[in-house]
């Protein structure tokens, strides 16, 4: 009798279907073939040359290079402040390469990407209290003040600051406290990506270690981070991957441990050899554990 069903030629039960692999999460940041030029005519120079880089959700990537290497240009291009000559930039899945100022402002208001300056006072309005500086991004989104203030208190705790600092002005805080407030402000809107420009270069050793530990925790919680720095040693213990820029070209990228212990490019070897903070990496780890036990400041 013909059933119309396919025969099992093996005589056994039908083979189970192979489950489809889950799709890889889209990158929080994807830079492809990026070229940037400054100037015109004979004065035209190339600041970035074919740079490609991706950052996964929850990944921390350190972009390292000396002054003039192109790292700040890369950050400014990712943030829509510089228009590339060629290539593309995708932030949070959106191709933002040709976004104008209006669309970029809308993207920032939605909180997809945030930026933390080297000088935290550039992130904080000197005429606003810490509370007003923190809640401003959520108020712009139309959220209520009570909700915004509750989140501000929660984030101050996350960056190990007391919530009684909400009533203070930025000028009343130490440099390390201001930098932690700037990080908290960047987190207010729940961004997928935060770009930080030299986040610890102006801090003393204790504050440097504490900020880097906070950043490491943010990455573990799912926020993608790009750390811009001239000092390989300052981010080697925090970054998952290191990307090395030299004269506008990406000369090496890899797991942070591999780049530090087995640098492939001569320029990277030079950076490793000239990074005094690498020699104190184990001491930094010990200090992180001690600092975690300290009360909030």
What are these regions, as identified by a protein language model?
Residues 235-237:
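A short, surface-exposed alpha-helical micro-motif characterized by mixed small hydrophobic
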Residues 169-173, 177:
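Conserved ABC ATPase signature
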Residues 147-164:
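Conserved ABC ATPase "signature" region
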Residues 42, 96-113, 132, 140, ...:
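ABC ATPase NBD coupling module
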Residues 79:
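Helix-to-loop junction immediately C-terminal to a conserved catalytic motif
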Residues 253-254:
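ABC ATPase "signature
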């Amino acid at each position: 009798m013909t059933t119309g069903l396919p025969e099992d030629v093996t005589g056994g039960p039908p083979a189970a279907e192979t489950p489809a692999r889950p799709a890889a999460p889209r990158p929080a940041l994807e830079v492809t073939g990026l070229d940037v030029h400054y100037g015109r005519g004979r004065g035209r120079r190339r600041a970035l040359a074919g740079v490609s880089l991706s950052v996964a959700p929850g990944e921390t990537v350190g972009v390292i290079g000396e002054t003039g290497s192109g790292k700040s240009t890369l950050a400014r291009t990712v943030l829509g402040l510089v228009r590339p000559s060629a290539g593309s930039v995708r932030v949070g899945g959106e191709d933002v390469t040709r976004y104008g100022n209006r669309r970029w402002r809308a993207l920032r208001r939605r909180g997809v990407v945030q930026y933390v300056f080297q000088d935290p006072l550039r992130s904080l309005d000197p005429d606003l209290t810490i509370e007003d500086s923190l809640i401003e991004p959520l108020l712009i989104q139309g959220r209520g003040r009570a909700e915004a203030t509750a989140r501000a208190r929660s984030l101050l705790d996350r960056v190990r600051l007391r919530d009684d600092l909400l009533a203070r002005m930025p000028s009343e805080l130490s440099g390390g406290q201001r930098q932690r407030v700037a990080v908290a402000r960047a987190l207010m809107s729940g961004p997928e990506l935060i770009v930080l420009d030299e986040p610890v270069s102006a801090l003393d050793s204790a504050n440097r270690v504490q900020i880097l530990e906070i950043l490491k925790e943010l990455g573990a919680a799912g926020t993608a981070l790009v750390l811009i720095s001239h000092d390989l040693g300052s981010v080697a213990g925090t970054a998952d991957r290191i990307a090395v820029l030299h004269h506008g070209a990406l000369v090496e990228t890899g797991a942070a441990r591999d780049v530090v212990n087995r640098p492939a490019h001569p320029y990277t070897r030079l950076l490793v050899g000239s990074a005094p903070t690498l020699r104190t990496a184990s001491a930094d780890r010990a200090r992180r554990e001690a600092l975690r036990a300290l009360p909030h400041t």
